[in-house]
């Protein structure tokens, strides 16, 4: 008998998932001039959710005050969530990450294209990484 202790960490998690359940996580990262605004974040998150065919469980929320000029946004979707974090840099730019987590697969390339268009990111200056894909055992 195989126990989860005999498996690699990603296999351990996959074994614990309900049959047929999957989890997909990815990150989009870029730098931009200036700072994000709450309105920009809300609009972007709503557009991204629609583009990916997801459903909002609640209106996107904004967190402020965790650092000077820093804003974070969270879109609670019915299949998990999407977060956007802005990290102000000493040179006046902002490093931004968008994390997409869902139990349904999604088009990461489409998400990256919307992100580049929305925030004016030049070609070659946006990074995408599919950080985790776990496929639960099938019944």
Positions of predicted regions on the chain:
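Polybasic/polar functional segments that serve as interface/processing modules
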Residues: 1-139
């Amino acid at each position: 008998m195989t126990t989860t202790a005999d498996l690699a960490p990603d296999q351990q998690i996959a074994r614990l998932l309900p049959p047929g359940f999957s989890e997909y996580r990815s990150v989009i990262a870029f730098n931009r001039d200036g700072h994000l605004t709450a309105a920009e974040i809300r609009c972007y998150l709503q557009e991204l959710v629609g583009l990916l065919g997801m459903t909002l469980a609640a209106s996107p929320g904004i967190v402020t005050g965790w650092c000077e000029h820093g804003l974070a946004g969270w879109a609670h979707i019915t299949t998990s969530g999407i977060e956007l974090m802005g990290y102000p840099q000493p040179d006046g730019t902002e490093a931004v990450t968008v994390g997409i987590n869902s139990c349904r697969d999604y088009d990461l390339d489409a998400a990256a294209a919307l992100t580049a268009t929305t925030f004016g990111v030049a070609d070659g200056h946006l990074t995408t990484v599919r950080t985790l894909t776990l496929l639960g055992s099938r019944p």
